[in-house]
């Protein structure tokens, strides 16, 4: 799914990375790559990665100051869908399952007491709820399965408008007509059990999605009156189940107290949190979040100060400064998504696969990566499943699947000419009459991407009409609207909602997901044979089988050159010298408040 900015513009998420929960939440499968998806991507010496940060043994106490340029999007767990939101959501809420912070290969039962149970026909998923977890004030009672049911049901409430309910929970019985109240697809036979009833054998993807914040319990008696407002006001009056809570008044009001929009937020300890029920150590006593300011000033303050982190992508000059002078305070997180060039597969010159291959062959992907900061923060992409996602190695790993139009990262005009001749242009240059419509995003590095793409197409003989617009406009008015017939969108991207290769490939490249507006399949990719294989792969249970099947689909998508991948992102994050930060590899390496401590 598309998780924009703060999951950082214009990268989409379907947005952030888990593993198959149905395998007992284990990290490895037999006879194949690890569930975490080996990448062979490493950071330079002296730089942290989430994988080499220690989650245990931190010092208890102290106050962490967080400096962020960006504002939160949503504090309601039913609405939250960005990296910066997730860091406070997962510190204050307990979904059914949660990620271990510094690896993609293990997901822990959180509100659940054990792994989900998928029936043999894959149409029923059963989860048992952990006892002894209580809501924060003012609710102050024990969580039951009904609270989890209400949390997910409200995802269908138009006043909440959860962005991924239909994608992952749409196969539940009655989900298509649900509007925020009970529906047949969710039942609670007792206070410790919740059962999901599906119309299709999609139990695996439903089980995977139980790591998302929509599954964090919400007390109906507290939230329902707030959910009747349009939009819901629950995000202004929050109840916590995690180790921390937003500072609030006696009525649970957060707005204006623990959260000052555009200014600050304060997380304090949840007095009702029971550490014996949780895998989080929660070392810190308090987290003070300051919002706004120049990213370069923020980054320098963090590097030169104490007790501070920046919990968003560091600005390029700050990354360079940290690399040269504060290297131990720099974290580089792999698996931060993919950037690619969307081309219109349905109409115009790029409906011809050989024209798409010619464009791919001609493109200087190294130059596009340099615009993003080079090898420290990106790798040249050679296919679609990105590092750390299961199936990455089987899909080709770093080198890629070995096709000539992919073999020259700086571009090869001779190979491009070969494919243009195959497409029916004997001179090896495009001689058609159509003017190519290119719509890119303003601001670095997106505008640089667009300009390089524009020049590459001109070098191939295309006439172009080139426009730059704001990122949100690019998606909402042009690249996400098929009727606009945009031929090329130079810098779109994707971040998976969880570490299943389906979450990388299905939505952006499956013809089933082409929509008249808000279309996430920017290139209108519609290959019936590949769509059928996706439908079969979606039903598989067990990550080794799923990784192998989706890796084959990745190779077929490359063979059809449905889009041109150019960058696998690695996110840079910075901390003060006395902070023992632990990054969430599943969430772009952002600092995890429940595991980070002060030295």
Annotated model-derived regions:
Residues 128, 143, 147, 160-225:
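Surface-exposed binding/hinge segments that line
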Residues 114-164, 195, 301, 349-352, ...:
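Aromatic- and charge-enriched surface segment that lines or borders ligand/interaction sites
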Residues 250, 376-423, 442-448:
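Structural transition elements
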Residues 102, 180-181, 210-281, 286:
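Gly/Pro-rich hinge or "lid" segments in bacterial periplasmic/extracellular proteins
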Residues 51-57, 357, 369, 383, ...:
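Extracytoplasmic/peripheral linker and loop segments enriched in polar/acidic and small residues
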């Amino acid at each position: 799914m598309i998780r924009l900015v703060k999951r950082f513009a214009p990268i989409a998420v379907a947005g952030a990375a888990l593993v198959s929960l149905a395998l007992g939440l284990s990290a490895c499968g037999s006879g194949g790559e690890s569930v975490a998806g080996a990448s062979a991507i490493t950071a330079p010496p002296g730089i942290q990665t989430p994988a080499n940060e220690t989650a245990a043994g931190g010092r208890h106490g102290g106050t962490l100051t967080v400096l962020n340029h960006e504002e939160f999007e949503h504090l309601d767990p039913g609405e939250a869908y960005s990296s910066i939101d997730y860091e406070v959501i997962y510190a204050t809420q307990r979904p059914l399952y949660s990620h271990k912070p510094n690896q993609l290969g293990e997901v822990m039962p959180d509100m659940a007491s054990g792994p989900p149970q998928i029936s043999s026909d894959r149409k029923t998923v059963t989860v048992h709820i952990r006892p002894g977890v209580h809501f924060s004030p003012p609710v102050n009672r024990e969580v039951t399965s009904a609270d989890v049911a209400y949390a997910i049901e409200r995802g269908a409430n138009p006043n909440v408008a959860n962005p991924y309910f239909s994608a992952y929970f749409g196969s539940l019985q009655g989900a298509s007509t649900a509007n925020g109240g009970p529906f047949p697809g969710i039942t609670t036979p007792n206070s410790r059990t919740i059962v999901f009833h599906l119309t299709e054998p999609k139990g695996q993807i439903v089980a995977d999605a139980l790591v998302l914040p929509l599954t964090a319990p919400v007390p109906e008696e507290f939230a329902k009156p707030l959910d009747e407002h349009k939009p819901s006001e629950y995000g202004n009056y929050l109840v916590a189940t995690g180790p921390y809570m937003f500072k609030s008044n006696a009525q649970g009001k957060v707005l204006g107290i623990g959260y000052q929009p555009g200014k600050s937020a304060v997380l304090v300890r949840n007095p009702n949190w029971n550490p014996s029920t949780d895998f989080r150590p929660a070392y810190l006593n308090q987290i003070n979040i300051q919002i706004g300011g120049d990213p370069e000033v923020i980054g320098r303050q963090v590097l030169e100060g104490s007790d501070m982190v920046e919990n968003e992508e560091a600005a390029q000059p700050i990354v360079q400064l940290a690399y040269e002078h504060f290297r131990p305070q720099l974290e580089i997180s792999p698996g931060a998504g993919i950037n690619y060039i969307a081309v219109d597969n349905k109409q115009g010159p790029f409906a011809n696969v050989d024209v798409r291959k010619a464009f791919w062959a001609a493109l200087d992907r190294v130059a596009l990566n340099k615009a993003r900061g080079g090898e420290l923060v990106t790798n040249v992409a050679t296919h679609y499943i990105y590092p750390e996602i299961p199936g990455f190695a089987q899909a080709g790993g770093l080198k890629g699947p070995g096709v000539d139009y992919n073999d020259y990262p700086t571009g090869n005009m001779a190979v491009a000419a070969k494919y243009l001749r195959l497409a029916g242009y004997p001179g090896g240059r495009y001689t058609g009459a159509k003017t190519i419509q290119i719509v890119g995003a303003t601001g670095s590095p997106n505008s640089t991407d667009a300009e390089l793409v524009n020049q590459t197409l001109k070098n191939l003989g295309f006439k172009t009409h080139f426009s730059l617009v704001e990122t949100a406009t690019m998606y909402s008015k042009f690249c996400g609207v098929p009727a606009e017939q945009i031929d090329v969108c130079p810098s779109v991207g994707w971040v998976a909602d969880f570490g299943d290769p389906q979450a990388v490939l299905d939505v952006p490249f499956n013809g089933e997901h082409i929509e008249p507006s808000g279309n996430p399949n920017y290139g209108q990719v519609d290959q019936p044979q590949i769509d059928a294989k996706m439908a079969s792969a979606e039903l598989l249970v067990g990550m080794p089988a799923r990784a192998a099947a989706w890796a084959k689909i990745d190779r077929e998508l490359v063979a059809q050159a449905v889009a041109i991948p150019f960058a696998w992102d690695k996110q840079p994050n910075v901390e003060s010298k006395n902070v023992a930060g632990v990054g969430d590899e599943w969430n772009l390496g952002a600092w995890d408040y429940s595991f980070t401590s002060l030295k």
